[in-house]
Design a protein with these regions (language model features):
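Alpha/beta-hydrolase active-site loop
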Residues: 129-150
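Gly/Ala-rich beta-loop-alpha elbow adjacent to hydrolase catalytic centers
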Residues: 154, 158-162
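Catalytic histidine-centered segment of alpha/beta-hydrolase-like enzymes
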Residues: 273-285, 301-313
Length: 321
């Protein structure tokens, strides 16, 4: 049953839509971009958050500014001397660097310089709103501040934003310079999110069209462009796509779409870890490490020939508690 707040919001948008679908679409887009509370919900989330804070307690915090906002980045091994790799880690919607900290520390323990970015409206970054342009702008600011990357690793919305950033998808923002890309549970398209949101809010056809038009106006690319399978990934960029077929938040079809889009894309199924636990699962960390260190051998997928399937992982994944 819809909550009282949702009923009121639906009613308000419906009334505004009768007066002006354009204004209702703009209001709906603002609601769509409103970020959730930063407070962890439930005992497991609180425990994971506090453990993450402890892992990052000694990390350098750097404030990044960009058109439209500011973001906070955590930097590990920033003062190390000598040549070393540099990685960027980006969390998903409603998450933060704390929840990505196991992966961040795992990478830092290899001796690499690791930057973990809190997207606008998340973690210790300013704001209450997030959209693709803000996310890609924050990523560009991190790249400008710290330099070219050996790899960028992103989860969910963060992964999708990295894919768009590396392809130079948004006008006015320079492409992200990275040698490799790791996408964990990341969507390959955006249109479905707006359709689902429109249904949740009970938007009429005219207001739905205005919502999608506003998304295009703000981000600089029409919403339909986000759903094109070709051109989202740089064909010359090695990409590791990590996904679980039991992911209930982002369908595994998105991983298949990345793999089927051409280029040097490798697909790793981490079944049993869902959408959130996947970022700290031991087999996933091992797969990422192997991919980043260039020790992975690949073979053609026996299923459909799209992309490649990593050969070092065949057995079913044991669920973690």
């Amino acid at each position: 049953m819809p909550s009282f707040a949702l009923k009121v919001t639906r009613s308000g948008l419906s009334g505004l839509g009768r007066l002006s679908p354009e204004l209702a679409g703009k209001a709906a887009f603002r609601l769509f971009c409103l970020t959730p509370s930063r407070r962890p919900r439930g005992s497991k989330a609180k425990s994971a958050y506090m453990e993450g804070r402890q892992r990052l307690i000694s990390a350098e915090q750097v404030m990044l500014s960009f058109p439209g906002g500011r973001a906070t980045a955590y930097r590990l091994n920033g003062g190390a001397k000598g040549p070393r790799k540099r990685y960027l880690v980006v969390h998903g919607w409603g998450s933060s660097s704390e929840y990505m900290s196991e992966l961040t520390v795992f990478l830092a323990n290899t001796g690499a310089e690791v930057i973990s970015l809190d997207l606008p409206g998340h973690g210790r970054s300013a704001g209450r709103f997030l959209n693709v342009r803000l996310a890609v702008s924050a990523i560009a600011a991190a790249s400008a501040r710290f330099g070219a990357l050996d790899a960028a690793i992103g989860h969910s919305f963060g992964g999708a934003s990295l894919a768009l950033a590396s392809a130079g998808f948004l006008p006015g923002i320079e492409p992200l310079q990275t040698e490799r890309l790791v996408l964990i549970g990341a969507p390959s398209a955006m249109g479905w999110l707006f359709k689902d949101f429109g249904q949740l809010m009970g938007l009429g056809p005219a207001t739905q069209m205005a919502l999608e038009a506003e998304a295009g106006r703000v981000t600089g690319r029409a919403l339909t462009a986000y759903d094109e399978r070709r051109g989202i990934l740089d064909p010359g960029l090695p990409v590791l796509v990590v996904h679980a077929e039991d992911d209930k938040e982002v369908s595994a079809d998105h991983a298949r779409a990345y793999a089927g889009g051409g280029g040097d894309v490798r697909l790793f199924w981490a079944n049993g870890f869902g959408h959130r636990r996947i970022v700290s699962a031991a087999p996933v960390l091992e797969a990422i490490s192997a991919f980043l260190s260039e020790t992975v051998k690949t073979e053609s997928s026996p299923e459909d020939g799209d992309g490649t399937v990593l050969s070092f992982y065949r057995s079913p994944v044991r669920r973690s508690s």
